[in-house]
Each structure stands twice: as C-alpha cells, then as structure tokens.
C-alpha cells in the first residue's frame, strides 16, 4: 500500500492532469528523484528547506501581539514562537522532508504544496485570495486572506497553514473577523 501511495503522490506532483485546451508551454513542474535524496543527513537542515527559508524569510508573517483568539472560540494558531520547527509545515516552514522506510529502504519525501493544476483551494476560497499564475504557481494573497482555512480543509494534503495576529482582519474588525492569514509554498513566484 505504501509503495502505491508514494508512487501516486509523485505521479500527481510530476504530471498534473489537464485537458487539451489547458496546455501551457509556461507550466512549471517539479521532478524529484527520490533515489538520490538522502534527506541531507549530513546537514542540520536539509538543503531544500534551507533554500526555501532563505528565499522566503522576508515574506514570513510578523504577528501583532497579543494574538486574539478566534471568535467565538478561545483558540488561535500562532507558530511565531516555533519558527525553527522544520519537522512540519508552518507559516514559517513551507517545505519539510518526511522520512519513511519501505522494505528496509529509507525514503525522504519533500512535502510542500503540489501546485495542483485545478487547485481546489483556489476554487473554494470565499475571499478570492488564491490565484494561479501562468506557470502554475498557486498563490495566496496575504493582503486579502482572512485566514478562514477553507483552503486547508479542501486540500488533500492539508498544506496551507494559518498564522494568527496578521492580515487584513486586523484593520477590519480584529476581535470578530478572520483568524489570520494562510501561508504555503508558491513555487517562489
């Protein structure tokens, strides 16, 4: 089962489904040879994670403190005190390596947004905050996102992650509206 799941996931990422009328010579894809990825076992931070963090560090959110809870629930998602966590996706870590072992072989799977060709998150966002470039990058506009997390709910991989204490809702109605902003890999678009 695990082998089939791994193969399916890679096939989905490398060869997104599209109709003949949707073909674009500008569409970008990522092909990763998992046989060559060793998880950068000799480094404290894998090279792909380090490169992503260096490229996007200026875009990471700086929440207003104290972070307000999501009304009417007394909770919120604040990763700002855990920015160095590279073991999962957060608003400060847009890619991580998942380690699995199949038949005694170690496999490292880069986990990040797959930039779905027909992205369900883009269709479902009630605020129209998600767009897709000609190159296929699925981008969340942090100036428009209210952090409703519908994109994460519909994402088959739960990729977008919310950071409270940032976003347009702070200007509109900080105690009643929204929950922050959703963040994810956008192909460095």
Name the predicted role of every residue range:
Residues 1-189:
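Non-ligating segments of multi-cofactor redox enzymes
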């Amino acid at each position: 089962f695990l082998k089939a799941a791994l193969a399916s996931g890679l096939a989905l990422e490398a060869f997104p489904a599209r109709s003949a009328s949707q073909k674009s010579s500008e569409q970008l894809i990522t092909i990763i040879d998992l046989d060559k990825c060793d998880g950068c076992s000799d480094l404290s931070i894998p090279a792909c994670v380090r490169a992503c963090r260096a490229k996007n560090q200026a875009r990471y959110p700086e929440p207003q403190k104290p972070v307000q809870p999501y009304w009417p629930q007394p909770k919120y998602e604040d990763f700002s005190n855990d920015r160095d966590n590279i073991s999962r996706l957060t608003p400060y870590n847009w890619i991580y390596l998942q380690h699995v072992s199949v038949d005694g072989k170690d496999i490292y799977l880069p986990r990040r947004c797959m930039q779905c060709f027909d992205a369900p998150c883009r269709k479902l966002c009630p605020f129209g905050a998600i767009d897709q470039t000609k190159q296929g990058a699925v981008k969340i506009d942090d100036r428009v996102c209210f952090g409703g997390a519908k994109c994460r709910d519909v994402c088959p991989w739960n990729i977008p992650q919310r950071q409270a204490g940032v976003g347009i809702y702070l200007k509109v109605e900080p105690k009643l509206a929204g929950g922050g902003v959703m963040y994810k890999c956008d192909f460095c678009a």
